[in-house]
Amino acid sequence: MPVGRKEQIVDCRAVMGLGEGGGLAQRGTFAEGLRNDVVVVAMSPGRRHITKPVCEITYGIREAGIQTSVLVLDAGGGIPSDAPQGSLGSTFGLKPDEARQVNRHKLCVIHFGNVKSHIIYKARLFLKYVTIPTIIVCQSPVDMEDFAKIGIKTLDVMPLEPKTEGTIVEIITGVVRGESSPQKKIDEIIESIKKHLG
């Protein structure tokens, strides 16, 4: 008999984990929850892209009793090729399989980094193919208008010419990449999820 805990079954790891004990998920990993309620999406791990806050966010959401899947993008680093400054290094992208995996859920939480222009252009490419309501989690202070200016549909501000299928329903800023996420930020994410899951 479990005392004070709810069991969650997670079908985990498409590929072997990285680091000591395999604790870090590699790019292309999809860990599916028992029910398709929420999916948390992380950028690809690398020197600059650390998946650490995503692990803590996911743990907090699951601890709140919400069924949660996790996807680590295969090409999550860099910026999209259609961004104004272009992509000098790696190029951000979304595979058709990844879009299908995300779209099976009711709500998406995606963690971006701390460069404003990278965040908004990555979000536009992501939401071009992801059709479910999405919560953006990032470090940089951004608002709905920043996204709407480049054609991203948002709950508060609709662009004149929408370029996305999906809609941003909430933005949570101040979550630093590679650092432990403060409990108040995790609580804020959980409250947003509960609000938009209905």
Swiss-Prot record:
GO BP, sorted A to Z: methanogenesis
Keyword Nucleotide-binding (UniProt): no
Disulphide connectivity of cysteines: none
This protein's record includes keyword Manganese: no
Keywords linked to the UniProt accession: Methanogenesis
One Pfam short name: MCR_C
Subunit structure comment from the entry: MCR is composed of three subunits: alpha, beta, and gamma. The function of proteins C and D is not known.
NCBIfam families listed in its UniProt record: met_CoM_red_C (TIGR03264)
Protein known as: Methyl-coenzyme M reductase operon protein C
Organism: Methanococcus vannielii
Gene: mcrC
